[in-house]
Amino acid sequence: MKIKNILLTLCTSLLLTNVAAHAKEVKIGMAIDDLRLERWQKDRDIFVKKAESLGAKVFVQSANGNEETQMSQIENMINRGVDVLVIIPYNGQVLSNVVKEAKQEGIKVLAYDRMINDADIDFYISFDNEKVGELQAKALVDIVPQGNYFLMGGSPVDNNAKLFRAGQMKVLKPYVDSGKIKVVGDQWVDGWLPENALKIMENALTANNNKIDAVVASNDATAGGAIQALSAQGLSGKVAISGQDADLAGIKRIAAGTQTMTVYKPITLLANTAAEIAVELGNGQEPKADTTLNNGLKDVPSRLLTPIDVNKNNIKDTVIKDGFHKESEL
């Protein structure tokens, strides 16, 4: 009986060792739009930590806001034999060919936060981006229900920027139609870069003799650039301005009263969930979707998370409570 038990233990041990030796390490290629932006640095760190805790290996590259660089980096990841591509696209309109290459190699593709259009991607995870725009516009009209509004969109090649604008206009249109709000300018900010937003805002102030009451800025980086221009004219804190991403600089401006609000998208939840989905895809599993979104080619299984309005009154109950920022940093 003892010999039988010993043999059984040995066989079980050998079997487990053999399974462990052949357990698949999922290789993930993470292609990021632009790591110069604080937002994506946080996503990367959280995603990599979670994916590695699930036994995956992650290769990260940043395109620094260049679509050709991103396509080249994705091709490089395909050649490295990754199992899954997680792509935060700079331009979601131009990646259909590299996605096709990936699919031909049996690689799964997850679009992270931004949709990839006209491509055979496997899954999409993001936030309800029209809702983001609605939160931005509503926060401003609650404070400035009439006056001159300037619309500062994000990158013209970012699909999300268009969704934010759709949400913004859903709120603003009745005010515009009634004549309460006048849109005195509408421009998109290349690369979401604050230096581009600064120039746009300077020109807008000049064109309107500084008579701007609210700026619908689509994220904190562009809000920061716009606020620089407003400050130079003595208008900082006097013009209502929105944001998004809950960047530390944006939260500091809200606390100081120079920025009205930001939209907090719980990035920890987004990145952790995306890592879980990527590993599931790499293991041949089918992640759970809560909806589908059409990208021009197919209805893509998707998971959309809920964004949160952050203002001076709820900083502690949102970004501080979640550990996204520390109170000592403010």
Swiss-Prot record:
<dbReference type="InterPro" id="IPR025997">
    <property type="entry name" value="SBP_2_dom"/>
</dbReference>
<dbReference type="InterPro" id="IPR028082">
    <property type="entry name" value="Peripla_BP_I"/>
</dbReference>
<protein>
    <recommendedName>
        <fullName>D-xylose-binding periplasmic protein</fullName>
    </recommendedName>
</protein>
<dbReference type="GO" id="GO:0015753">
    <property type="term" value="P:D-xylose transmembrane transport"/>
</dbReference>
<dbReference type="GO" id="GO:0030246">
    <property type="term" value="F:carbohydrate binding"/>
</dbReference>
<dbReference type="GO" id="GO:0016020">
    <property type="term" value="C:membrane"/>
</dbReference>
<dbReference type="InterPro" id="IPR050555">
    <property type="entry name" value="Bact_Solute-Bind_Prot2"/>
</dbReference>
<comment type="similarity">
    <text>Belongs to the bacterial solute-binding protein 2 family.</text>
</comment>
<comment type="function">
    <text>Involved in the high-affinity D-xylose membrane transport system. Binds with high affinity to xylose.</text>
</comment>
<keyword id="KW-0574">Periplasm</keyword>
<keyword id="KW-0813">Transport</keyword>
<dbReference type="GO" id="GO:0015752">
    <property type="term" value="P:D-ribose transmembrane transport"/>
</dbReference>
<dbReference type="GO" id="GO:0048029">
    <property type="term" value="F:monosaccharide binding"/>
</dbReference>
<keyword id="KW-0732">Signal</keyword>
<dbReference type="InterPro" id="IPR013456">
    <property type="entry name" value="XylF"/>
</dbReference>
<dbReference type="GO" id="GO:0030288">
    <property type="term" value="C:outer membrane-bounded periplasmic space"/>
</dbReference>
<feature type="signal peptide">
    <location>
        <begin position="1"/>
        <end position="23"/>
    </location>
</feature>
<dbReference type="Pfam" id="PF13407">
    <property type="entry name" value="Peripla_BP_4"/>
</dbReference>
<dbReference type="GO" id="GO:0042732">
    <property type="term" value="P:D-xylose metabolic process"/>
</dbReference>
<keyword id="KW-0762">Sugar transport</keyword>
<dbReference type="GO" id="GO:0055052">
    <property type="term" value="C:ATP-binding cassette (ABC) transporter complex, substrate-binding subunit-containing"/>
</dbReference>
